[in-house]
């Protein structure tokens, strides 16, 4: 089973690429979705996060107010690292369970969608890594359109991520989401075929 990693800085268009890959029949583990589940009502990280950061970050439904917590941790690197020390091991366990299930199902390939793939060492378990890029102007425009995003918060997030040039140097495939979507999608499909995956192209 081929393990493909997908990464890129915030708002580069990873979700679009992941959606295309999923449409092609490749199962995906989305680390952001895993985090949302862990911090949601009844999630596995809720109790420890509340113990470490305070009950005021809890919601009436039994989860974590991710926006308030995000505002808190991204303004203080030490707090961000503390949160990551709680959440990242749980995400890895979630991912490992997914991989084991896909191996048992004899999947030809899977995709690991991880914004901090290189930063967390997740690339070591991947056979291939796709890096998605976009211009600074494009990423800023997309990110600042998100609810609750500010320029200061965006700067803090970008500072916690590996620079794009370093990611490019470690990529097996680089996709530029500033290019026309059809061009990028065809580049992706061609590459998947090159690495030995049978892909049906829908024209």
Sequence positions of predicted segments:
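Residue-level signal for inorganic ion chemistry
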Residues: 13, 32, 83, 111, ...
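Well-ordered beta-strand positions
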Residues: 27, 33, 128, 172-173
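An amphipathic alpha-helix signature
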Residues: 24, 46-50, 136-141, 151, ...
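Small-molecule kinase domains that catalyze NTP-dependent phosphoryl transfer to phosphate-bearing small molecules
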Residues: 95, 124-125, 142-145, 149-196
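ATP-dependent small-molecule kinase phosphotransfer cores
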Residues: 36-108
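ATP-dependent NMP and nucleoside kinases share a basic, alpha-helical "lid"
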Residues: 95-105, 109-146
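Hydrophobic "anchor" residues on beta-strands that sit immediately upstream
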Residues: 3, 26-28, 108-109, 123, ...
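Glycine-rich phosphate-binding loop of ATP-dependent small-molecule kinases
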Residues: 1-64, 75, 190-203
């Amino acid at each position: 089973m081929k393990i493909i990693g997908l990464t890129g800085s915030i708002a580069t268009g990873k979700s679009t690429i992941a959606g295309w890959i999923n449409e092609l029949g490749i199962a995906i583990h989305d680390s952001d979705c895993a985090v949302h589940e862990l911090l949601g009502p009844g999630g596995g990280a809720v109790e420890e996060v509340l113990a470490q950061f305070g009950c005021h970050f809890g919601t009436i439904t039994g989860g974590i107010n991710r926006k308030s917590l995000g505002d808190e941790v991204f303004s203080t690197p030490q707090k961000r690292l503390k949160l990551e020390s709680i959440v990242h091991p749980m995400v890895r366990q979630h991912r490992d369970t997914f991989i084991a299930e896909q191996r048992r199902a004899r999947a030809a390939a899977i995709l690991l969608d991880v914004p901090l793939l290189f930063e967390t060492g997740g690339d070591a378990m991947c056979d291939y890594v796709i890096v998605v890029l976009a211009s600074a102007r494009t990423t800023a425009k997309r990110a600042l359109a998100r609810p609750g995003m500010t320029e200061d918060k965006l700067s803090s997030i970008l500072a916690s991520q590996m620079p794009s040039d370093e990611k490019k140097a470690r990529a097996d495939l680089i996709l530029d989401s500033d290019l026309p979507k059809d061009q990028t999608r065809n580049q992706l499909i061609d590459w998947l075929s090159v690495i030995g995956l049978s892909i049906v192209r829908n024209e």
